[in-house]
Amino acid sequence: MSNSQPPRSSSSSQERAEELRRLLNRAAHAYYVLDAPDMEDPVYDQLYRELQDLEHQDSTLVSADSPTQRVGGRLADGFRSVSHRISLFSLDNAFNRDELHGWYSRLLKALDRTPAAGSPPPTLPMVGELKIDGNALALSYENGVLVRAATRGDGEQGEEITANVRTISSIPLRLHLEPVPAWVEVRGEAFIPDATFHAINNERLSRDESLFANPRNACAGTLRQLDPSVVAARRLDFFAYTLHLPDEWQERRPLTQWDALQWLGDAGFKVNPNAGLLPDLQAVEQFFDTWDTERRQLDYATDGVVVKLNDLRLQDAAGFTQKAPRWAIALKYPAEEAPSKILRISYQVGRTGVITPVAEFEPVGLAGTSVSRASLHNADRLVELDLHDGDTIVVRKAGEIIPEVVRVLPELRPALAQPLEITKTCPACGSTLVRESNESATRCINSSCPAILRGALRHWVSKGAMDIDGLGSKLIEQLVDRGLVQSIADLYRLDMALLGSLERMGSKSAENLIQALNASRSQGWAKQLYGLGIHHVGDVNAKAITTAFPNADSLNQAACHAPESITAIFGVGKEIAQSLQQWFSSPANQRLLDELRSLGFSLSLNEEEQSRATTAAANHHLTGSTFVLTGTLPTLTRSQAKEQIEACGGKVSGSVSKKTSYLVAGEEAGSKLTKAQELGVSILDEEALQNMLRGST
């Protein structure tokens, strides 16, 4: 039996909808963030259904902060890339007290507070926060309403996942503030609590689905689901830890990191309750030691402690390096260790012929994953460990990421166990291995070695080199093992008939691969040089080298007859020049270059590279100039502006200092603008920057 309600007027419906949103959002905050429910479930459900009915009757009542919008419709086309209003920097790490004190000394130097010889260092109050092992999110609010959520990405750009983030109940859809700033940027960590993670894996086990390795992987995979209802079902959580406000809120903004955390809590965010206000380095060490012991009692993973300078004005003064803030450091917990038994030594052959011994041992669980292999790096490490057949070893994850063998337990060694020695022959081709007197690496020097060829091909097709889609490791293995490809050049002789003879290669896939191979012929000279896999020549050095030597002939001439002209390039040393000399002196490599030319490769700068080189030459006056970018530019993203400045010889820094030549300021420029004005740094808008890039004054 139902009770009919008289129809509401549009104004009363709007008022009721606003009231329901307020009540429901307050109840959700009390339940999910404060862990102090103030509304019975049946009451919440009744009010929720009433709001749903109102919004269904009048779609204009639906708002972005409505609790009914936490789970949206399926995303049709994946995720789009978005630029962050404010960059997300990574943190430098410290793994012991010496590294912590080293960071503190650098911080004092950046703040011009280095003590005189023999004097104790000044104390600076810090805030200690647990480093949550999850996934960083950038949340954007406008007029108090969540309008965008994005992954960290590369720090400049991330993937927009707003629909998924709306499902996280500990993230407010509307800020609990009055009045609200025009915009707010919040940073924090999404994560899956341990109990939730185990429940998810139990559900997957019951459906015979593969299990997630650890909560962090589960969280990352969940955030990239195309269906927000799947995200909602996995019950992600979130801790907020960083806040950015517009300049017009200068008088209202927090002055310390501690106050910023309180601000975030007042605004409706869940803030980790275990943060601490720390007066000095000794308190930092005590905070770290406490949580290194007590972290196992928590219901979520934490892999360290983050220490931040408390005074936000001093944070601005300390600034940033190219990749990290000077005013913060991540103190990582000692790596988790576990014993295991050695089974065998296997070997990997790199693309330059380097032989890497790999310890294979009985599987052990470390930091949430199962580990059964660890690199031993080279023969010296094998000797240093004194590994014997059947030894019990201690394994850990360095930085809780990379497995490594720490030591051997000789007291558990079996009787008559034999020492394990590095192989004398290549495991891939059987050739005798060599070792130069000045190197720790043991190498295969057989140019026909299939393992070296496979590595060279993988490098050539990689994203940083020729970026050839559809040519993965499995396919490369087939091509090499069947003798269809014996050099990089052979890739460009593949046709539909040859590809069609391979396993799992349909006509459409073969057609796409041939198109990708043909398209790669037009890649720039820098990518081609990098793709050749010359020892010590990375992608950055390749750009510098090809700008100085615009084609293979000029580089060949310099490498073989004038190596000093190569070392004259900024950032290129003797080691690289020697590698280039050795590579270009090889008849086999000269044949490869001839083959590539015959297959349509120019082995010279393409139009885009020539344009950049011309621009750099025309604007050589930017060499020696340091730029800082702040705010939003009208047409250029920060990445584009940085790339163009660097192409003209300039350097881009993350913070303003006495050494800054120019500050490029866009809309909503922050404290960097104020500091630049105080220091008398020249201020440019985008138009002035563009004129400078063109060489105009």
From Swiss-Prot:
GO terms for molecular function: DNA ligase (NAD+) activity; metal ion binding. Keywords: DNA damage, DNA repair, DNA replication, Ligase, Magnesium, Manganese, Metal-binding, NAD, Zinc. Its EC number is 6.5.1.2. The keyword tRNA processing does not apply. Pfam families: BRCT, DNA_ligase_aden, DNA_ligase_OB, DNA_ligase_ZBD, HHH_2, HHH_5. Its cofactor is Mg(2+); Mn(2+). Gene3D superfamilies: 5' to 3' exonuclease, C-terminal subdomain, 6.20.10.30, BRCT domain, DNA ligase/mRNA capping enzyme, Helix hairpin bin, Nucleic acid-binding proteins. One of its GO terms (cellular component) is cytosol. Residues 617-697 form the BRCT domain. The active site is at residue 131. Belongs to the NAD-dependent DNA ligase family. LigA subfamily. It catalyses: NAD(+) + (deoxyribonucleotide)n-3'-hydroxyl + 5'-phospho-(deoxyribonucleotide)m = (deoxyribonucleotide)n+m + AMP + beta-nicotinamide D-nucleotide. Zn(2+) binds at residues 426, 429, 444, 449. It is an enzyme of class 6 (ligase). The keyword Mitochondrion does not apply. It comes from Synechococcus sp. (strain CC9311). DNA ligase that catalyzes the formation of phosphodiester linkages between 5'-phosphoryl and 3'-hydroxyl groups in double-stranded DNA using NAD as a coenzyme and as the energy source for the reaction. It is essential for DNA replication and repair of damaged DNA. HAMAP family: DNA_ligase_A (MF_01588). SMART domains: BRCT, LIGANc. This is DNA ligase. The lineage of its organism: Bacteria, Bacillati, Cyanobacteriota, Cyanophyceae, Synechococcales. GO terms for biological process: DNA repair; DNA replication. NAD(+) binds at residues 41-45, 90-91, 129, 152, 189, 308, 332.
